[in-house]
Amino acid sequence: MPRLHDHVWNYPSAGAARPYSLPRGMIAAAACPQGPGVPEPEHAPRGQRAGTTGCSARPGSWHHDLVQRSLVLFSFGVVLALVLNLLQIQRNVTLFPDEVIATIFSSAWWVPPCCGTAAAVVGLLYPCIDSHLGEPHKFKREWASVMRCIAVFVGINHASAKLDFANNVQLSLTLAALSLGLWWTFDRSRSGLGLGITIAFLATLITQFLVYNGVYQYTSPDFLYIRSWLPCIFFSGGVTVGNIGRQLAMGVPEKPHSD
């Protein structure tokens, strides 16, 4: 026959104290590696609760990070435009006066700022598309890989002006293979491929519009030669800037884990 004290221990009374549990916001603050945060309310939307939006302690930190990344990408675009412009001037591809330094700051002064703005837009667009598609890019997420990607892109641009090919088809196929090789080596994402093709198409159309209206000129009388390598340069440039934008969006680089 069961005893009375067995029932008392097996079935707790209604007045028994429940085990104490920490609020959900305090648990997220304790797990956040960037420091303690503010406990979040229970009625917050699902996308804003702990574990879904990272460890941002201040509401304005996201905007501050966005401005910083935009400035870095804009500066990179301006510097890269100046460097590539110097390479093309040395190969007599673009039509400029003999004074190279004066050319950079007088003729076509709007080109570097436009390239910087385009770099900022593209660099911010890549991680946004990755987040929207739910496919975070994790292939070669390190600054050393980004630096190698920049070097390969500059090499492709230099080869497009330096190497001599028998016809435009051979030039286009060679540069297309190099550009796809750059994407396969440093990106390998569907979003990166799609954005690169879109950027190449739109940028080539804008360049043709500027040339046909006399805003921008090339030394080569055959513009078909220029159009044969422009899409490849824009494609590889979009992939390169996208890798920089993704790396900047990471914040603190993650250490590789071996499972």
Swiss-Prot record:
Extracellular topological domain residue ranges: 90-108, 165-167, 214-227
Stretch list, region Disordered: 36-55
Transmembrane segments: 67-89, 109-126, 142-164, 168-186, 192-213, 228-245
Site positions for Required for the recognition of 25-hydroxycholesterol: F153
Residues spanned by motif KxHxx: 253-259
Keywords, in A-Z order: Cholesterol metabolism, Endoplasmic reticulum, Isopeptide bond, Lipid metabolism, Lipid-binding, Membrane, Phosphoprotein, Steroid metabolism, Sterol metabolism, Transmembrane, Transmembrane helix, Ubl conjugation
Cytoplasmic side: 1-66, 127-141, 187-191, 246-259
Residues where Phosphoserine is found: S189
InterPro entries with a match to the protein in the record: INSIG_fam
Compartments where located: Endoplasmic reticulum membrane
MF (Gene Ontology): oxysterol binding; protein sequestering activity
Pfam families referenced in this protein's UniProt entry, alphabetically: INSIG
Ribonucleoprotein keyword on record: no
Main location per the UniProt record: endoplasmic reticulum
Membrane topology of the entry: Multi-pass membrane protein
Gene Ontology BP term (one): inner ear morphogenesis
Induction notes from the record: Up-regulated progressively in the fat tissue as they develop diet-induced obesity. Up-regulated in differentiating preadipocytes.
Signal peptide segment: none
Cross-linked sites for Glycyl lysine isopeptide (Lys-Gly) (interchain with G-Cter in ubiquitin): K138, K140
Role played: Oxysterol-binding protein that mediates feedback control of cholesterol synthesis by controlling both endoplasmic reticulum to Golgi transport of SCAP and degradation of HMGCR. Acts as a negative regulator of cholesterol biosynthesis by mediating the retention of the SCAP-SREBP complex in the endoplasmic reticulum, thereby blocking the processing of sterol regulatory element-binding proteins (SREBPs) SREBF1/SREBP1 and SREBF2/SREBP2. Binds oxysterol, including 25-hydroxycholesterol, regulating interaction with SCAP and retention of the SCAP-SREBP complex in the endoplasmic reticulum.
Domain notes: The KxHxx motif mediates association with the coatomer complex.
Protein family per UniProt: Belongs to the INSIG family.
Assembly mode: Interacts with SCAP; interaction is direct and only takes place in the presence of sterols; it prevents interaction between SCAP and the coat protein complex II (COPII). Associates with the SCAP-SREBP complex (composed of SCAP and SREBF1/SREBP1 or SREBF2/SREBP2); association is mediated via its interaction with SCAP and only takes place in the presence of sterols. Interaction with SCAP is mutually exclusive with PAQR3.
Name recorded for this polypeptide: Insulin-induced gene 1 protein
Organism: Mus musculus
